[in-house]
Regions:
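N-terminal export signals and maturation junctions of secreted/periplasmic proteins
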Residues: 21-81
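Non-catalytic cell-wall polysaccharide-engagement segments
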Residues: 21-37, 122-229, 366-384
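Short, functionally critical alpha-helical segments immediately adjacent to catalytic or ligand/cofactor-binding
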Residues: 83, 87-107, 135
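Short glycine/threonine/proline-enriched tight-turn/helix- or strand-capping micro-motif at secondary-structure
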Residues: 226-262
């Protein structure tokens, strides 16, 4: 009886509370013909290494200034845009650059026109930043869309989510994209000196269970309560439900927003003035988006509870490289070696998370934080 009453109380509406949530990136659906063509194509090619597809932990240590000086000095002014969207979508920046070179030769033969449209006809957006955002988000969503479809199934071919994601992008402009995929592999390996293909003696990346050496705390001080909406994917649609939007209920744009703490210790990667990641020695990481006043730079090693910065109270700062947000909050995500990872059954400050059945599911029968037998629903006070 106690649990029934408790759930009833927790699902009562809150009066006067600002329910701030984040971005909803929607991409074009593939037609059935395109889907069939992708499947036929990926069955005939060697798989892309998924660890090279994502913004993996090794890449967090890259000297990106040096990389751009050596390979694309004329794109240095766009480095922040590339790293922001590569970091946000967790797509390897070198892969994005290789795809640009494949489509427009913007690295080897830069011009005013191909700098404006670096991905050419792969994107229907106009402008360098707009195309980078579009391709990074599309590659992200296609990658996890395919991962969801094959989860739990026996793989009968070497193909994987990375291969399917790239083919789904290339197929927009070509009937036989595997030729371009082979060219992309060559360009990438020239840029990075690392193989892009999954070798025959290397097993595909697999989803991992929660690590015993990794523990997360809520990103705010002990004794205080913040609020969360339903779990969702990093982009707000699709899969996996890796992200939560936290705020302390202080109000809308222009309000006095609080400082955000690191949920665990580790090494910092700062992608932009509003986007930062902390990578733990276990390989897991948490990412914090819509931030301001960031206190650390890439390479800094911090402890759990370190003050990362505030979540932004200014919409332009919260969306420092574009995107969407309904109000001030921190967009908090879990990753493992660059792959967004479902928060289902993970513990944070000793609360177990049930992610629900859909993006932003705030029905307490589905989404909740559970601690000591009690459930806290979406938009209810979460005490640390």
């Amino acid at each position: 009886m106690k649990s029934t009453l408790y759930l009833s109380l927790l699902t009562l509406p809150m009066i006067g509370f600002v329910q701030a949530q984040g971005q909803h990136h929607l991409i074009d659906e593939l037609s059935s013909k395109q889907t069939a063509l992708i499947q036929a194509t990926v069955n005939s090619v060697i798989a892309i290494d998924e660890n090279e597809f994502v913004f993996n932990n090794a890449l967090q240590n890259e000297d990106w200034n040096d990389f751009f000086y050596r390979h694309a000095p004329h794109l240095l002014e766009f480095k922040a845009v590339i790293l922001h969207w590569a970091g946000h979508a967790s797509i390897n920046p070198k892969l994005l650059l290789a795809l640009m070179e494949l489509q427009s030769s913007v690295l080897s033969e830069p011009s005013k026109s191909n700098i404006m449209l670096p991905f050419g006809t792969l994107s229907n957006k106009a402008g360098f930043a707009e195309q980078v955002q579009d391709l990074a988000i599309t590659l992200n969503q296609r990658f996890y869309e395919y991962a969801q479809k094959v989860e739990g199934k026996v793989r009968s071919s070497p193909t994987n989510s990375a291969t399917s994601s790239l083919i789904s992008v290339l197929i927009k402009t070509q009937l036989k994209p595997y030729g371009s995929l082979n060219k992309l592999v060559g360009i990438y390996e020239t840029l990075s000196n690392v193989p892009l293909l999954l070798s025959q003696n290397k097993t595909p990346a697999a989803s991992l269970n929660p690590s015993n050496s990794f523990y997360m705390s809520f990103p705010w001080p002990s004794g205080y309560a913040w609020y969360s909406g339903g779990a969702h994917s990093n982009t707000g649609s699709g899969y996996p439900y890796s992200s939560l939007d936290f705020n302390n209920g202080s109000g809308g744009w222009g309000s006095n927003t609080p400082w955000v703490q690191a949920a665990h210790g580790g090494t910092v990667t700062r992608y932009s003035s509003c986007n930062i990641r902390v990578t733990h020695s276990s390989g897991y990481a948490t990412q914090y988006y819509h931030m301001s006043n960031l206190q650390y730079r890439s390479g800094d090693v911090i402890n759990s509870g370190a003050w990362l910065g505030r979540y932004a109270n200014n919409k332009n700062q919260a969306l420092c490289q574009g995107g969407q947000s309904s109000g001030p909050h921190v967009h908090f995500s879990l990753l493992n070696n660059g792959r967004f990872t479902s928060l289902h059954n993970w513990y944070i400050s000793n609360y177990r998370i049930d992610v629900g059945n859909s993006n932003y599911d705030d029905n307490c029968r589905n989404f909740y934080f559970e601690k000591n037998g009690y459930k806290t629903c979406a938009w209810r006070a979460l005490y640390k």
